[in-house]
């Protein structure tokens, strides 16, 4: 989730005007290290597949289409390879009578074991299941009797545990200062065996989330610190040895928001100007400069395509078969 502009709260609320005012930027791929050549061609086309949305987020390749959220339009949609857009669910954020322009739609999406999709609802402050017909059923909404902040992004670990970030972006009356906020912090949660644990509680604005191929390294993009943090993950889900994986320089066009980890353990993350690609050791391999502010990304098709949600549009970039599809993807 990316705070572009605000008319409701400082740092996070109204997206459409800011998206319309973005300065013109040239789409291109920047090769910083020769290792990038094994991941993506320097002349790979950056294709705008669909446009005209409020602010796009939460991309997921599922059932042969890209599912995505419009956090301002408050809709869940799909788009196919040909650019055909289908509305799957209106009021995807689940909040009755939402204020105009607030970022309270749905956000992160991930396939679940039964073929449905888990969806983070910023407005209703919960995670729900959505089936192919758009039917919604509750999944997670509280921790120790207190309502979640506004779940943002999700990932399944190889052991079947669900991890997700819970920043206050959907609390549109001041985020951390919103009187409706019940949790004392902005946790990273792990759900396994029917039990929800707040594993990390000391980040400012935890946002994007990803795991290494073996599930032994957890990556969290903290928008509030412009940093991707990495943690060791034990078999029981305990985390340790936090380190700063990468701190983004200041710049226009995005921040520490969405991220994904490919089959080789490379980290693809949104940052200023577009998508940044890092080796497992944190070395910058290259960048995809985007014409709009990128909020999130997803590997799709046969692992040979990168789909990007960026402001008002959906983009696709061919890659070299390294994309890791999420667990339970089909």
Regions found by a protein language model. Give the residues of each.
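Blade/loop signatures of beta-propeller domains
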Residues: 21-45, 326-328
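Flexible "stalk/tail and boundary" regions
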Residues: 45, 63-64, 79-82, 113-114, ...
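Short, conserved, GDST-rich strand-edge loop motifs in beta-rich repeat architectures
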Residues: 22, 164-183
